[in-house]
């Protein structure tokens, strides 16, 4: 088959014109990259430094108990710096031995004076060091995440206060239900965000110590002072006393952390989806604040597409998938199965960081259109007040009788495209029970927002009390 090269060239140009802008937009979006601070926590330099810090702390603990010479512990501590792990040497050694920890130990030991290198990693197993390093990294990552969530919480509190009394349509199953206030909707976001913060704080109470129990968790390589060495190591690292049981083959604390990240992700995914939908042309009640120069489409100049809210939905799904993989670590083989991968812990933290960095500007500066909210309330011509009408009529003719009567009125109003109030007035047998002033009040949506404004006050008060307990 003969290929028309001119046509092929045009197709390539079209593909580039369409895909390159999309690629550029995606990498430059607020959610495209994690912050440098979060990235550095899991970067190679910091990861290796943490490993050296743990090994040095182990040496100091063992020296205190007379297990290794103090001079060796001093030298190991003095050389606990990644400058003694040149990348080229490390890569060459890893290629030779095929084991990351052994490669680190071998290269590092060459820089030790005397025989101090012989006492590096004394009695420990690789998983002891790595699992402890993951705890340190996750706790550092959690601090960033909690601070971001707290900052977002403050923005949401301001928003809830501002729109405490702003009526909007409450929707169930995608249909108009009853009026609420926008402040009440934001209050739901505040409460869910705070519950996730408390979950993460609780999780950190358990994810607060490392492990040093040897190859199969029996302390065999550490001897009779194994318990003391482990406890001293955790004290040297500023961690809590160790768990008495081996958890190399369990990983439930990591799984819990992953699931809390998933919950955080899904909360913001829901918020993002809500803003995405409320911004749609057919609803138009809120809008992401965009610069006047923003371009929504390469072919449709009128488009003002939601970007950050979409990012929240996408990232929430990815975070949940990482949590599922981390959960699988719990199904280990015997005492330890080596089926876990630190990459998943790193990725779930980086993506949660990206998600929160997208959420911060979105929720701090969003356009809200109260007039459109009121237009949407009036769109169904009073049908949303059917519940209140039913309760008022129910006092006169009985609740169940009133329910059926109002249901029939609602269907008639919907079919004839008239207001529910007019449908009532067209039925003298029902209208006789209601005075004009009573009817006017029944169909005033502001008179049927329940305790929505007071609910906002209660949510904010409860949240402010919990904010006083934040220490991270």
Predicted regions: what is each one?
Residues 3-15:
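Bacterial N-terminal signal peptides that target proteins for export
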Residues 13-24:
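Bacterial N-terminal signal peptides
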Residues 27-213, 218-219, 223-232, 236, ...:
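A helix-coil-helix interface module used to build multimeric assemblies
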Residues 66, 312, 352, 402:
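Residue-level signal for inorganic ion chemistry
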Residues 161-183, 285-303, 334-340, 364-384:
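Glycine-rich cofactor-pocket loops
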Residues 250-285, 293-349:
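A conserved active-site cap/scaffold subdomain adjacent to cofactor or substrate pockets
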Residues 318-399:
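Long, amphipathic alpha-helical stalk/connector segments used for oligomerization, subunit docking
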Residues 365-427, 461, 465, 469-471:
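C-terminal alpha-helical interaction appendages
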């Amino acid at each position: 088959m003969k290929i028309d090269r001119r046509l092929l060239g045009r197709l390539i140009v079209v593909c580039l014109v369409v895909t390159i802008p999309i690629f550029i937009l995606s990498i430059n979006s607020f959610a495209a990259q994690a912050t440098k601070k979060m990235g550095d926590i899991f970067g190679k330099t910091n990861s290796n430094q943490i490993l050296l810090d743990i090994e040095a702390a182990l040496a100091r603990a063992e020296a205190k108990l007379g297990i290794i010479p103090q001079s060796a512990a001093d030298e190991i501590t003095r050389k606990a710096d990644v400058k003694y792990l040149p990348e080229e040497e490390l890569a060459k050694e890893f290629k030779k031995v095929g084991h990351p920890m052994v490669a680190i130990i071998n290269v590092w030991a060459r820089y030790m004076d005397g025989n101090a290198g012989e006492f590096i990693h004394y009695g420990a197993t690789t998983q002891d060091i790595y699992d402890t390093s993951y705890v340190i990294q996750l706790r550092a990552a959690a601090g960033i995440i909690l601070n971001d969530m707290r900052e977002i919480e403050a923005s949401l509190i301001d928003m809830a206060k501002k729109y405490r009394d702003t009526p909007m349509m409450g929707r169930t199953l995608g249909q108009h239900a009853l009026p609420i206030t926008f402040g009440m909707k934001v209050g739901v976001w505040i409460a869910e965000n705070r519950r996730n913060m408390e979950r993460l704080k609780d999780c950190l109470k358990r994810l607060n110590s490392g492990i040093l129990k040897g190859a199969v968790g029996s302390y065999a390589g550490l001897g009779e002072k194994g318990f003391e060495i482990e406890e001293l190591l955790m004290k040297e690292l500023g961690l809590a006393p160790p768990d008495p049981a081996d958890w190399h083959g369990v990983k439930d604390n990591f799984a819990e952390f992953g699931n809390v990240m998933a919950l955080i992700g899904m909360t913001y995914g829901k918020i993002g989806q809500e803003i995405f939908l409320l911004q749609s042309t057919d609803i138009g009640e809120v809008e992401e604040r965009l610069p006047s120069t923003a371009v929504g489409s390469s072919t449709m100049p009128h488009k003002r597409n939601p970007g950050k809210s979409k990012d929240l939905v996408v990232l929430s799904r990815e975070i949940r998938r990482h949590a599922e993989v981390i959960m699988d670590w719990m199904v280990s083989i015997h005492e330890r199965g080596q089926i876990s991968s630190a990459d998943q812990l790193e990725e779930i933290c980086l993506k949660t960081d990206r998600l929160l960095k997208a959420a911060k500007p979105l929720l701090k500066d969003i356009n809200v259109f109260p007039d459109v909210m009121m237009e949407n309330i009036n769109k169904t011509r009073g049908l949303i007040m059917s519940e209140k009408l039913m309760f008022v009529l129910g006092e006169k003719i009985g609740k169940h009788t009133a329910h059926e009567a109002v249901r029939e009125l609602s269907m008639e109003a919907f079919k004839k495209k008239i207001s529910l109030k007019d449908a009532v007035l067209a039925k003298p047998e029902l209208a006789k029970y209601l005075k004009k002033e009573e009817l006017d009040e029944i169909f005033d949506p502001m008179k049927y927002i329940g305790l929505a404004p007071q609910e906002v006050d209660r949510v904010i008060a409860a949240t402010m009390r919990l904010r006083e307990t934040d220490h991270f």
